[in-house]
Amino acid sequence: MCLAYFVSGYFKLVSPQWRNGQAIFDVLNTETFGRPNMAELIQDKTNLQKTVTWCTLVFELMFPLVLFTPYPVVYIFFLGGVLLHGGIALVMGLNSFFWAFIATYPALWICSLQLQAVLGY
């Protein structure tokens, strides 16, 4: 799962639309997963577009750190994932995507605890 997030973040990072902060607006304008009414709402809000786009990108690139993050902070990663995938489910209608990714979080938490025990922190 960490690899899935990281690779997704990497390919977003090399995309000009993600780097310039326009990707969320572009996604909302797609025929398959778009929501033209939502795209229209954020059309003139370039700071919001950039913030959401870059928060998504940074979250995905940093997610592998969940394996090395101590107990209370790991929940911030999981909360970020729930918000990210919840937003995707609501906006794009990808409900099974939400459940598939969130279902892996307990296993990631256990792996995180075991890895931290091995590393001694």
Placement of each model-derived feature along the sequence:
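A cytosolic-side transmembrane-helix exit/cap motif
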Residues: 43, 95-104, 118-121
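Membrane-interfacial catalytic/cofactor-binding modules of polytopic membrane enzymes
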Residues: 2-59
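Short tryptophan-centered beta-strand motifs in secreted/extracellular beta-sheet-rich domains
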Residues: 64-65
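Juxtamembrane boundary at the C-terminal end of a transmembrane helix
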Residues: 109-121
